[in-house]
Design a protein with these regions (language model features):
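Transmembrane alpha-helices and adjacent helix-loop boundaries
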Residues: 1-311
Length: 311
């Protein structure tokens, strides 16, 4: 175990605890930048999904891990971002303005959900957000004139300033850039008075209120920021899949997102990335591992779901 002694406030709020962190983060970034030349196309696609889910995980970690508000309908924000991006793209907007619209609308919906949720806590908040998830899924399925209903919407490759990002490598770097930007934003937020207020609310609402922290304001702000990051992830998810439909943003997706941050480690920015890595790669390794099992076991229906659930 390494002990780090801090002698001034600037060391306490630094992004890196010591020089070793700078080295390892730099090495990780180097590997991520070189990944398109090191990985096959299939695994590069999986890594792209890890980056996309990491952005969503950062938002949910901000809400659940740092503010203590659990959402069981978070896939709804993902869906709002994805469908907004799809509709704006079909209307002729380029990637950046469409992304701004997707992020903004998701954030606005987060505020709408956050305000009623101020009156409930714990399992009741979970039920409220779960109900919201069902409502959004139903709206996406019924509003056929805009969302295409159950037939879904097809998307094309993102258009950046007149240039189509159609290659897997180009889209990967776009996701990597937005992931780094989101991570730095969350890290700096957590070092600010706002981030400290989130943590204070998570630890004790009574103590936080006694220190002058406005619970309603900061809870709503946490919902808004979490939903905004989910909107960014949803926009990227829509372009990566190139087809979206309401069932992609149902209760199972919400449970996966919540498990992602719980398994990764609540209250840790790293946990969002570890959880996303687990969520994306575990089913792939289960599928690959079936080849080494006896035929009777390997071809048994539901094996993947069973192992995934047990883990």
């Amino acid at each position: 175990m390494r002990f780090v002694f801090k002698t001034d406030y600037s060391q306490d709020i630094g992004l890196a605890k010591h020089k070793g962190h700078v080295f390892w983060y730099g090495l990780l970034m180097l590997l991520l930048v070189l990944s398109p030349w090191l990985l096959q196309e299939y695994w590069l696609a999986q890594l792209t999904f890890v980056l996309i889910y990491s952005i969503v995980g950062l938002g949910l970690m901000l809400l659940a891990g740092f503010t203590g508000l659990f959402s069981i309908g978070h896939a709804a924000f993902l869906g709002v971002g994805a469908y907004t991006q799809a509709v704006c793209t079909q209307a002729g907007m380029s990637f950046v303005p469409a992304l701004v619209c997707a992020t903004g609308l998701s954030a606005a919906v987060g505020v709408v959900v956050g305000l009623p949720a101020l009156r409930v806590k714990g399992i009741y908040l979970g039920i409220a957000t779960l109900s919201f998830g069902f409502i959004v899924e139903e709206v996406l399925a019924r509003w056929e004139s805009v969302t295409g209903g159950n037939a879904g919407i097809h998307l094309k490759a993102p258009d950046l300033w007149g240039q189509s990002v159609s290659s897997a490598e180009g889209f990967y770097f776009l996701c990597l850039f937005l992931t780094v930007l989101s991570t730095l934003g969350v890290l700096n937020l957590l070092r600010s008075p706002t981030g400290r207020a989130f943590v204070a609310i998570r630890d004790s609402e009574i103590s936080a209120q006694s220190m002058g922290i406005h619970l309603a304001y900061y809870k709503t702000l946490s919902f808004m920021m979490s939903a905004a990051l989910a909107g960014v992830g949803g926009a990227l998810y829509a372009h990566k899949m190139q087809f979206i439909s309401p069932e992609q943003f149902g209760i199972l997706q919400s449970i996966d997102l919540l498990l992602m941050v719980v398994i990764g480690g609540l209250g840790s920015v790293h946990g969002a990335f570890l959880g996303a890595l687990f969520l994306i790669t575990l089913p792939q390794f289960i599928t690959l591992g079936k080849d080494y099992l006896p035929v009777v076991i390997g071809q048994a229906p539901g094996l993947q779901s069973l192992v995934y659930g047990l883990v």
